[in-house]
Swiss-Prot record:
This is Small ribosomal subunit protein uS8. Part of the 30S ribosomal subunit. Contacts proteins S5 and S12. It comes from Yersinia pseudotuberculosis serotype I (strain IP32953). One of the primary rRNA binding proteins, it binds directly to 16S rRNA central domain where it helps coordinate assembly of the platform of the 30S subunit. GO terms for cellular component: ribonucleoprotein complex; ribosome. NCBIfam families: PRK00136.1 (NF001109). The gene is rpsH. GO terms for biological process: translation. GO terms for molecular function: rRNA binding; structural constituent of ribosome. Keywords: Ribonucleoprotein, Ribosomal protein, RNA-binding, rRNA-binding. Belongs to the universal ribosomal protein uS8 family. Transmembrane segments: none annotated.
Length: 130
């Protein structure tokens, strides 16, 4: 059976991995997942990520903890296959009054809400991370 929403699966694996205090989680890789992982790493929500395998690439995320607690408090899918959510540059949300981030897919690539606001871009809101 095919996976309907691979991004929601990625976010769920991160959420479950941190709830179980796992060091790392693995999942099938894609360009969008790698772009999201890159944003999460730049913002300090994960330690690192790497791609392994040639024929079927696997993405491995090293999860991050601070004083025994998970760094990612909440991670929530917003735009989904059945209901895409697009926002203009003026309508981009602030997650937890600026403490969290919104991961946004723009015409210039995947970036945070702050970077999109700075670049004057809108796009599809993939998820909220806090």
């Amino acid at each position: 059976m095919s996976m309907q929403d691979p991004i929601a699966d990625m976010l769920t694996r991160i959420r479950n991995g941190q709830a179980a205090n796992k060091v790392a989680v693995t999942m099938p890789s894609s360009k969008l997942k790698v772009a999201i992982a890159n944003v999460l790493k730049e913002e300090g929500f994960i330690e690192d990520f790497k791609i392994e395998g040639d024929t079927k690439p696997v993405l491995e995320l090293a999860l991050k903890y601070f004083q025994g607690k998970a760094v990612v408090e909440s991670i929530q899918r917003i735009s989904r296959p059945g209901l895409r959510i697009y926002k203009k540059k003026d309508e981009l949300p602030k997650v937890m009054a600026g403490l969290g981030i919104a991961v946004i897919s723009t015409s210039k690539g995947v970036m945070t809400d702050r970077a999109a606001r700075q670049a004057g871009l809108g796009g599809e809101i993939i998820c909220y991370v806090a």
